[in-house]
Swiss-Prot record:
Domain of life: Bacteria
Keyword Disulfide bond (UniProt): no
Molecular function (Gene Ontology), one example: ribulose-bisphosphate carboxylase activity
Protein name, per record: Ribulose bisphosphate carboxylase small subunit
Gene Ontology biological process terms from the UniProt entry: reductive pentose-phosphate cycle
Amino acid sequence: MSEIQDYNSSVSDPSSRKFETFSYLPELGVEKIRKQVEYIVSKGWNPAVEHTEPENAFDHYWYMWKLPMFGETDVDAILAEAEACHKAHPSHHVRLIGYDNYAQSQGTAMVIFRGPISAKC
């Protein structure tokens, strides 16, 4: 049996913080984010955008940007809403969520824009 590798993290170390899906991978580029939105749409999930201050990123509740985009299938419209949220709140983390109506839960959630991370977080 192999040993379990410990994940060294610290709330006081900004470079060690991880956020949800894909946070252990290199940062997603524009095309990869587009692919994730296409996946959300292909699954029939309802996209939504949320944001919060970096110091509150580990709280359970983030601010919802408008309402979830029920039935939206236009990838460009979804990306435009995420970009609008980022422009309105440039110092906040912005995450994209895909709500699964059937399972009545989040199908996916990922931080797509990160606000500046300071040691006080």
